[in-house]
Every structure is written in structure tokens, then in C-alpha cells.
Amino acid sequence: MYSPQVLDHFEHPRNSGDLADADARVRVENPACGDILELSARVEGGRILEVRFRAIGCVPAMACGSLITEMVKGKTVAEARAIRKDAIVQKIGGLPQASGHAAQLAVDALRALLEKTALNV
């Protein structure tokens, strides 16, 4: 049902938890299914140095939360802003049709985080 990448990120989440010295912290919820994704990041010189996530929800939501942190860590804010839902779906090895919302939740949380980071710089 789920790709090996989804299961790996779910069973062995990367960058899980909260970043105590974060420059920005956001919480985004999908009202249709109740999934919640929180991101916190430390940005210096326009580059994302550290990022953490916490997720409450389905397996794909947790996996996409883990993956998005790997995708943006070390990237510039501009590079992170360019990440789209289809890139997440491809990198995670595909998602069932009914689980596409998980990749969108990750993108929405990332956009909110980057916006908040820009306001705090």
C-alpha cells in the first residue's frame, strides 16, 4: 500500500521534535482529515540550518513531515520556496490517491514557516 520510502520515514522519522532555539515555528492543520504538522527552523544568512517537525495524523502525513525536513535542511530560503507537492510525492516514492493531502500539508507548513521566517529576519 505504501512505498518503502513512506514506511522508512514513518518508522524512522528524521529531524523529529521541536527546535528550542527556532527563529520560526508554525502549526498547520488539514481541517478535512485532522492531520497536524508543526515545523520549527533556525535560519542564518538566508539558509535553513536546522529544521524539526512534529506530526499528528496518518502514516503519509508523518512521512511527508520527515521528508520535508530532509529536503530543506541546508537549503537557501529561495531553494526551499521552490519545493512543490509533486516533488515530495516523487521523492517519497508515490502516495495513494487518497493520501495526496499529506504532501500538500507539508508544502503548506513549509510556506507558512518560510513566511514567518522572513518576518522574523
Feature locations, PLM:
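Short connector loops at helix/strand junctions that flank enzyme active sites
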Residues: 21, 34-36, 48, 63
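Short beta-strand elements
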Residues: 30, 35-45
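A generic alpha-helix surface/boundary motif
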Residues: 35, 62-66, 82-86
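Alpha-helical support elements that line or immediately flank enzyme active sites
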Residues: 60, 64-75
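A short interface-forming secondary-structure element
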Residues: 42, 46-47, 51-61
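C-terminal binding/interaction regions
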Residues: 1-20, 25-27, 49, 75-79, ...
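Short, thiol/selenol-centered motifs that function as redox-active sites or metal-ligating centers
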Residues: 33, 55-64, 102
